[in-house]
Amino acid sequence: MFDRIEDAIEDIKQGKMIIVVDDENRENEGDLVMAAEKVTGEHINFMIKYGRGLVCVPMTEKRLNELGIYQMVENNTDHKETAFTVSVDYKECTTGISAFERALTVKKLVDDNSKPEDFTKPGHIFPLRAKDGGVLVRAGHTEAAVDLAVLAGLKPAGVICEIIKDDGNMARLPDLLEFAKKFGLRIISIEDLIKYRMKNEILVRRVAQAKLPTKYGNFEIVGYEEILTGKQHVALIKGDVNKEPVLVRIHSECLTGDILGSLRCDCGDQLHAAMERIGQEGGILVYLRQEGRGIGLLNKIKAYHLQDQGLDTVEANIKLGFPPDLREYNIAAQILKDIGVKKIRIMTNNPQKITELSDYGLDVVERVSIEICPNHYNEKYLKTKKEKMGHLILEV
């Protein structure tokens, strides 16, 4: 359905437009997107005539500050936090509204020789302030446009325009696919762009390393930090991990289960079972800071409250406005690659974890089951994981 990110990047490099689609649970929209430094009056005219949305120019915060172009409002109450700045025109434009004068303004925004006094305000071009870190920080069209320009080796700025149907309603995916076919444009998703960046960029750095004696044996503990977010994770290494395939457990943080001994889940039991087996056989335990299947500790406690009222773990997440599972494993894959591991035997009951690790370039040669005997408090939880989340659990 969607084109390859590599092909889209090549089109951006050549000055072509593409269509970028965001998540159906977000805006569920498609934008025409191209590199700002490649724009012409013809491109702007196409966007106005066929896209029909608002022509905007996503740029970095650094560049906008250099040009003295600041936020449109001090308190941004837009529900998607789209960071509009004051609109601008290039000072030598007449009205600034024609397709060709708008293109001139865009070109001057990315011209290294431009100065703040070269622009009049307000105008007819709407710069947007992209978040540092791009789509890995905010999964919006603003960040996607800047990311694509950078990946194409161009200046970090794009031109975007929403696609609206003939009847005035927003074009959704079926309409966008038809639009792409009609005009011969590539179409990609922001989700695929996120995966591309996660797979091809280094997003963690090794910060510290020390010996860690435990009741399961003597481990080496290695501390990692995510470059974009500062979030911290650790890996416990036992024995020689140069002999592949390596036994691996990727464990997501669970304060209530891992530390407080909660009987509501099987997390603590799984953690200690994994440490014991790795302590005996050698291997790696990656401990990820994504509490509550990614929704955070306080939201997990809210989910517990809903479960006390009869909802299951999936229903509780959805009631709170979250997917059943928000966890991601790209950081774990990068940690394993940093350690030098590529071929693994993964201790998990979660097939999605295997799929994601494989997508990020690891060779998963075996799934090692990690069965925990259910108790009165977590039996419903385990059944829900098995029946609704596809976990390969035999004991319930």
From Swiss-Prot:
Cofactors named for this entry: Mg(2+); Mn(2+); Zn(2+)
Name the positions where Zn(2+) binds. 254, 265, 267
Residues where D-ribulose 5-phosphate binds: 26-27, 31, 138-142, 162
A GO term for molecular function = 3,4-dihydroxy-2-butanone-4-phosphate synthase activity
Q: Which residues bind GTP?
A: 249-253, 270, 291-293, 313, 348, 353
User: Record's Gene Ontology CC terms?
Assistant: cytosol
Q: Where is this region: GTP cyclohydrolase II?
A: 200-396
Q: Which GO terms describe its biological process?
A: riboflavin biosynthetic process
Q: Where is this region: DHBP synthase?
A: 1-199
Q: Which domain of life is it from?
A: Bacteria
Residues that hold Mg(2+) 1 according to the record: 27
Q: Which reaction does it catalyse?
A: D-ribulose 5-phosphate = (2S)-2-hydroxy-3-oxobutyl phosphate + formate + H(+); GTP + 4 H2O = 2,5-diamino-6-hydroxy-4-(5-phosphoribosylamino)-pyrimidine + formate + 2 phosphate + 3 H(+)
Keyword Transcription annotated: no
What is the stated purpose of this protein? Answer: Catalyzes the conversion of D-ribulose 5-phosphate to formate and 3,4-dihydroxy-2-butanone 4-phosphate.
Name recorded for this polypeptide: Riboflavin biosynthesis protein RibBA
User: What is the primary gene name for this protein?
Assistant: ribBA
